[in-house]
């Protein structure tokens, strides 16, 4: 159990059998009445976000996740399949759980799969991924007075804004937290 006063972004709690990731936690002490904690949480099972208010000092169940490094094999559209490279055991995750990270997954990529009580509940992709640009408009010299950007479609289907000098076939590094171009790799 953890006090609501100790809730911070990144902590995972179990409320009535459902896992939530704390996105924001704001401690409020009004002039009149007792203090409370306003929390924005993301439901791990489907990615939906809710806001909830707890009394200060109230106890909630903290969930500790086990993390195992696994290899991403493939997706059949609805489900994503991962394999433990030591035991060759395969785990399948639904598209609901994968909604915010699926655009960064490339076959063969190593990711951390999170387990709670033996059941896979989510994944962590690397902070930076290197992906090939498969479609972008050619950058024309003299288009802008200062550096501009253009959309580029990557091999995974993700679309990111890149500098004008990026061409099709270039390998770029992307920050998966923000979805932003970092640098050209090759």
Swiss-Prot record:
Alphabetically sorted, this entry's keywords are:
Cytoplasm, Elongation factor, Protein biosynthesis
One GO cellular component this record assigns the protein to is: cytoplasm
Tree of life domain: Bacteria
Q: Name one Pfam family in it.
A: EFP
Q: Which GO terms describe its biological process?
A: peptide biosynthetic process
Pathway-wise, it operates in: Protein biosynthesis; polypeptide chain elongation
| Principal localisation | cytoplasm
**Keyword Protease attributed:** no
InterPro entries named among the record's database cross-references: Elong-fact-P_C, NA-bd_OB-fold, Rib_uL2_dom2, Transl_elong_fac_P/YeiP, Transl_elong_KOW-like, Transl_elong_P/YeiP_cen, Transl_elong_P/YeiP_CS, Transl_elongation_fac_P
Annotated GO molecular function terms are: translation elongation factor activity
According to its UniProt record, where is this protein located? Answer: Cytoplasm
Q: Which NCBIfam families does the annotation name?
A: efp, PRK00529.1
**Family designation:** Belongs to the elongation factor P family.
Q: What does this protein do?
A: Involved in peptide bond synthesis. Stimulates efficient translation and peptide-bond synthesis on native or reconstituted 70S ribosomes in vitro. Probably functions indirectly by altering the affinity of the ribosome for aminoacyl-tRNA, thus increasing their reactivity as acceptors for peptidyl transferase.
HAMAP family recorded:
EF_P
The entry's protein name is Elongation factor P
Q: What is the lineage of its organism?
A: Bacteria, Pseudomonadati, Coprothermobacterota, Coprothermobacteria, Coprothermobacterales
